[in-house]
Regions:
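Hydrophobic alpha-helical segments and helix pairs
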Residues: 89-114, 118-121
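Residue-level preference for long, well-ordered alpha-helices that form the structural scaffold
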Residues: 75-78, 82, 114-117, 121, ...
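A short acidic, helix-capping loop that chelates divalent metal ions and anchors anionic groups
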Residues: 65-75, 109-114, 146-150
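Flexible, active-site-proximal loop/turn residues at the rims of small-molecule/cofactor binding pockets
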Residues: 38, 107, 145
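N-terminal pre-domain/capping segments
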Residues: 1-98, 126, 165
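Alpha-helix N-cap/helix-start motif
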Residues: 14-17, 42, 114, 149-153
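Short beta-strand segments at enzyme active-site cores
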Residues: 34, 58-59, 98-105, 136-143
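Acidic/histidine-rich catalytic cores of soluble enzymes
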Residues: 19-31, 46, 51, 119-167
Length: 167
C-alpha cells in the first residue's frame, strides 16, 4: 500500500510550521517531512507530532547559510561546518524519532575540482553515516535534476549509487 507524506515546508504555508502538522493530519496524512525544522525546539516538535498522530519521516540537514547554498558536503573549507551542522541535525532527528536525514552536497561552479569534491563528499557522508547509525538515523542522498538545480553536485542516481558503494 502506498503511503504519502506532506512536505510541510511547502504545504499549508499560510500557517506556522507547527500548525502545519495538525493541518496535515486533518488532510489525512499520517506522515510529514520538513526541510528546515530547526527553529522549533525538538521537544515541541516531538509533542506536536505526537498530538497530531503524525510521524516525521524525513528532515534535511542544514544546507548552509549563504545565498544559493544547497549543502555543505563537497567543500574542503567547510568540513567542520558540515560536521557541526550534520551532528546537530542527527541529534534533532533522533530527538523527534525521525529516522531519515537528507544530506545535501552543494553547488559547484567553474572552479570546482569535481574529483576532489567527490572525495570530500564521500568522506563526509561516511562520517555522517557512522554518526547517524549510532543515533538510529539513516543518511539519505537525493540527486537533484540539473535543469531546476544547475550546478548542484549530485545530479544522477548512478552517481549516488557509486558514492554509496564506495563507502
Amino acid at each position: 500500500m502506498l503511503k504519502f507524506a506532506s512536505n510541510i515546508t511547502y504545504l499549508f504555508n499560510n500557517i506556522d510550521l507547527v500548525s502545519r502538522i495538525q493541518a496535515s493530519a486533518g488532510a489525512g496524512f499520517q506522515a510529514v517531512e520538513c526541510q528546515r525544522p530547526y527553529d522549533i525546539p525538538s521537544a515541541k516538535m516531538r509533542r506536536s507530532l505526537a498530538d497530531a498522530g503524525v510521524e516525521m519521516v524525513l528532515i534535511n540537514a542544514p544546507a548552509g547559510d549563504g545565498d544559493g547554498d544547497k549543502g555543505l558536503g563537497i567543500f574542503s573549507g567547510r568540513i567542520s561546518e558540515f560536521q557541526r551542522e550534520t551532528e546537530r541535525a542527527i541529534v534533532y532527528a533522533a530527538e523527534i524519532d525521525c529516522q531519515r536525514l537528507h544530506v545535501m552536497a552543494g553547488q559547484t561552479n567553474q572552479d570546482t575540482d569535481l574529483n576532489g569534491a567527490e572525495t570530500i563528499f564521500k568522506d563526509n557522508i561516511a562520517w555522517a553515516a557512522e554518526l547517524g547509525q549510532r543515533h538510529g538515523v539513516r543518511i539519505l542522498l537525493e540527486p537533484l535534476n540539473p535543469i531546476d538545480n544547475p550546478g548542484y553536485f549530485l545530479t544522477q542516481a548512478a552517481q549516488a549509487v557509486r558514492l554509496v558503494e564506495a563507502i
